[in-house]
Every structure is written in C-alpha cells, then in structure tokens.
Amino acid sequence: MQNITDSWFVQGMIKATSDAWLKGWDERNGGNLTLRLDEADIAPFATNFHEKPRYIALSQPMPLLANTPFIVTGSGKFFRNVQLDPAANLGVVKIDSDGAGYHILWGLTHDAVPTSELPAHFLSHCERIKATHGKDRVIMHCHATNLIALTYVLENNTALITRKLWEGSTECLVVFPDGVGILPWMVPGTDEIGQATAQEMQKHSLVLWPFHGVFGSGPTLDETFGLIDTAEKSAEVLVKIYSMGGMKQTITREELVALGKRFGVTPLASAVALY
C-alpha cells in the first residue's frame, strides 16, 4: 500500500515549508501555502483518506475550481512542524462539484482546518489559472523580512516598488518582468483582502501586503519559492543600500530595456517609464 506521506506533493510541501522556516519568513504560524493537484495525483492514495471526510462550505462559491484537489497548510500551524507531523499540519482537500465547499480527504487531524487565508489563495488560484492558461499551480504567502521593511520606506505603488527591486539585482527583471503588485493595508483572513489580492494576481505573480508579507504564484513549489527568494534577496540589497546612504549609481532604464530584450521578456511598462 502506498503511503501518501511519501508522495511527491507531501514531500514537496515539507521541503517548501521547512525551507521557508529556515529563511526566517514564517515565524510561529505565519505564512501559508497551497498547491493545486490533479485527480491522478491523489487517486493512488485513496486508502489513506479519512473514512468520513469533513465538509466545509466556502464563504463564496468557486465554480472554476469545482472537483479540484489541493494540498494546503493548516490554520494556526507552524511551518517548522510540518516535517515532524505532516498529517497534523497539512491537508488534502477537494472542492465539490459546484464549487460551494470542500471535503478534507486527508490530514488536518484533530479537527484542524485549512489556513485562514484560504479565500485569498483560492481566489488567486482562479485568476492565475486564467492568466497563465492553467500553468500556475502554487500560491505561497510568507513574511519575507526585507520586502516587508521596504513597504515602510518606499512609496507603496507598483511601478516604484517594481523598479527598485529590478535595480536591486540584475536577475529580478528576468524573473518577474510582470512586476510586483501592492495593496493598501487590509485586515488579513477576509474575503476583501482575498479579492484585492486576486485582482492584482491578474497582472502580477508577486503581490505585496504592506507591513505584513508577500504573495507569490508559480507553476511549481520550487519556482514559486525561487520567485519570492529572488525578490527578497533584492529587497535585502536595497535595505543595505538605504542604510549606507542611498544609491550613487544604478541600472539605467536603457539597460533594463536591453536586459528584457536579451532574455525575451516584456518588462512592466509603468516601471520602465518611471524615470
């Protein structure tokens, strides 16, 4: 009998959550992670499923996600503990046929429930499915230290944050040419912040929540982790630059355009045109 804890998706979630904890992005129960699966991924592990899966209604219907399985982190769970007890800290859920709710097929033991940011995740999954023609499968939220710090000292608008992050490290324009969306501060764990995040996810694979954290989307766990890691590295460089008195020189607009041409990407126009 195959054990679901040995599956690629449970092992992938263990690695991603452990790596994020080691990075310092997910203190206590901070952060959440969801991965969209296919029926073929979970079918071999049906014998591991709960005999009577709990059903939880969604706060709003998600018909685009009907019959779709996900693996998710749990509410109030610590990323550092996922590797110690995956079944207590992770769950495989499946949206019902009309998108009105989901069953917890595996994990989330002792009456645990999925992350409180599930509305933001599911709404963002819907938008990224449309934006990437189904390619993106992962939504990751974490408290990346230096990205948060920048939201206190830079004007919180997409063009400026994007441009500064591109300047902080040459690879950034190549990794996220679509730029970084940013919201006003909002109460977390609500449909409102979920809807606002999803709206930005129509245009950007990275979305900042000021004074709180970042949302990232990608086709795989590695790609999504790497996306956030790249932006966070640039933010760290910028924090050091500003602490040393600011930039004396930087990558120019012409150089950013040349970089985009070399790697075949189209940089966010508003960030390129900023200055």
UniProtKB/Swiss-Prot annotation:
Active site: E117
Enzyme class: lyase
EC code(s) of this entry: 4.1.2.19
GO molecular function: metal ion binding; rhamnulose-1-phosphate aldolase activity
InterPro entries referenced in this protein's UniProt entry, alphabetically: Aldolase_class_II_sugar_metab, Aldolase_II/adducin_N, Aldolase_II/adducin_N_sf, Rhamnulose-1-P_Aldolase
The UniProt record lists the keyword Metal-binding: yes
The protein's required cofactors: Zn(2+)
Gene Ontology cellular component list: cytosol
Subcellular location, record wording: Cytoplasm
UniProt xrefs under CDD domains: Aldolase_II (cd00398)
Cofactor note: Binds 1 zinc ion per subunit.
Chain sites annotated for binding Zn(2+): H141, H143, H212
Keywords: Cytoplasm, Lyase, Metal-binding, Rhamnose metabolism, Zinc
Pfam families attached to this UniProt entry: Aldolase_II
Enzymatic reactions: L-rhamnulose 1-phosphate = (S)-lactaldehyde + dihydroxyacetone phosphate
GO biological process: pentose catabolic process; rhamnose catabolic process
Involved pathway(s): Carbohydrate degradation; L-rhamnose degradation; glycerone phosphate from L-rhamnose: step 3/3
Protein family membership: Belongs to the aldolase class II family. RhaD subfamily.
Function: Catalyzes the reversible cleavage of L-rhamnulose-1-phosphate to dihydroxyacetone phosphate (DHAP) and L-lactaldehyde.
Quaternary structure and partners: Homotetramer.
Protein's name according to its UniProt entry: Rhamnulose-1-phosphate aldolase
Gene: rhaD
